[in-house]
Structure formats: C-alpha cells, structure tokens
Regions:
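Internal intein/HINT superfamily modules and their associated LAGLIDADG
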Residues: 1-288
Length: 288
C-alpha cells in the first residue's frame, strides 16, 4: 500500500508553519493514530458538510492517498468521508507531538508550540471539536440613559461557543485562553465516557467573547473549515451596527445601556485586536 501512494513524510518533524499547527490541532480533535506491526495509520473521518477540511489536509501533506466515501456507521445514513495515511515515521512523529494511540486518555495541551502558531492550532481544534451557535434572542426593557424617565427595548443576543475534549486537555486550553487573551474563567462541564475517562466541555457566551475568539482564530488565517467560519460570520454579521457600537467595537452611536458597574468595567476592557478597524468579518449589512 505504501508503495502505491506517497506523502510528505517529514511534514510533522517540526511544527513551524500555520498549516502544520492547524492540521495538528485538527488531528488532536478528530484524528486517530494507530500503530501496526510494520507501519502506522493516521485516519480522519468527517461528515460530508466538512469534507473540504480533508482535501486541504491532503493537499498540505502532499498525499496521493484517496479520500474515501462511506455511509451508515458514523452518523446514521448520512454520508461521511475518511482519509487514511500509512507511514511508520509519521506515526512516530505524531506520537511525539501528543497524538498517541489512545489519545483520549493521554492528550495534553501542546505547550511546546510557539505563541504565534497557537491561534492556528486552536482553530484546527475548533474545526474538529468546537461549535458556535445562536439561541433564541430575548427582549429586555431598560432605562434610556439619554432620556431620563424613559425606557426602551434592548435585544439580548444569546450567542455561544464551546470546545469539547478530554479532561486532560480542555482545562489547559481554558487556562491558555485566560492567561494569553483575557478570557474569564467559566465552569467546565464533565461527563463520563465508556472507557473510564472524562469528557470535558468549555463554553462561553456573549457577543464580546465571540468577537474575541473570532479575531484570535481568523485574523491571519489561510487554512480553515469553510462551514464553521461561515457560520461564525453569519452570527456576527447578524449583530446590528448599533449593537457593535454599544460594545465600543466600531465607531457609531454612543453606548446607551449599562446595567451595572460590573458591566461598565467589562465593556471598558480592551479586546486584543478588536479596536476600530480590527479583525471583524466583512458584513455588507453592517452599514445598512
């Protein structure tokens, strides 16, 4: 099999580029490194809606191995695709980078990565085991600070993102986001798995956190999953220009609703890279 197909066997000897960091992050989330008697097998499976990621990995690693279509045993009757690569040296490289044969029991945060590459690693992991969504919006009646005695309606956007993974990985990802990017500490949710290890979910809500994560992951990105980036931008673009102005992220009307001293403090906090002209998605609706 190895004689029929080729790939860049030195790809992971040194993780020193955006592509390598992103793909390593994705493999941390969704890859499987299996040792065989004479070789090793890297396998990555994705549903059809995210198959573009497999082709990007295939191109980056210069592989001639095919991406195979399957159906039935991953998620009901929906089609999915699997990318296999075989190589003993590749397996050894991934093992040294933390992708062991039973990584759900051993996976730890890759502190060996340079900070300049960490956003790409995080984006790769997010494309594998992260989610972003908007729940039902709510209306609140609040005081109008510019017109004493009057009230107005305020739309509360219920936007969230999360990362899921092992209990040996997610807490350290959160620690990095707190120390490097100023995220607050949130409660982590744990659940037991069949193989006696614990799954862990880290969830954040609020527009400010979404903009912050978007900027971290996509401000200089050239490789990413199309679907999740588009979903992220659809949610962000659904926030009106007025909402952005209230957050102090773009020029516009002054902030009109501050419900508490804590909220004042939160809103005055600078978001790295999110000043006026920062890395917001290009939304044609923002100026309407």
């Amino acid at each position: 099999m190895n004689r029929k197909h080729v790939f860049d066997q030195t790809f992971f000897e040194k993780v020193d580029t955006e592509e390598k960091a992103y793909i390593l992050g994705f493999i941390y989330a969704d890859g499987c490194n299996v040792k065989h008697p004479t070789t090793a097998e890297l396998s990555i499976a994705q549903m059809e809606r995210d198959v573009d990621i497999l082709y990007k990995i295939k191109d980056a690693i210069k592989s001639t191995y095919p991406i195979s279509e399957r159906k039935g045993d991953l998620s009901g009757d929906e089609k999915y695709f699997v990318f296999y690569i075989y190589g003993k040296h590749l397996g050894e490289q991934l093992n040294k980078l933390g992708v062991t044969q039973r990584k759900s029991l051993t996976l730890t945060f890759p502190e060996f990565l340079d900070d300049t590459l960490m956003p790409h690693f995080i984006r790769g992991y997010f494309d594998g085991d992260g989610s972003v969504w908007e729940g039902k919006r709510k209306k609140m009646v609040v005081k109008n600070d510019h017109r004493p005695g009057e009230y107005r309606e305020r739309i509360v956007h219920n936007v969230k993102f999360n990362f899921t993974g092992s209990s040996t990985f997610i807490p350290y990802l959160q620690k990095y986001l707190i120390e490097k990017y100023g995220f607050s500490e949130t409660k982590l949710n744990y659940s037991k798995a069949k193989d006696d290890h614990r799954h862990c979910t880290m969830e954040y809500s609020g527009r400010k956190n979404l903009y912050k994560l978007y900027d971290i992951m996509y401000s200089s990105a050239t490789i990413y999953g199309e679907r999740k980036k588009a979903k992220f931008e659809k949610i962000l673009c659904a926030l009106s220009e007025k909402s952005l102005s209230e957050m102090g992220l773009i020029a516009g009307t002054p902030e009109t609703v501050i419900s508490s001293e804590a909220e004042k403090s939160e809103r005055s906090t600078t978001i790295p890279g999110m000043e006026v002209g920062g890395s917001l998605p290009k939304c044609p609706t923002l100026s309407e």
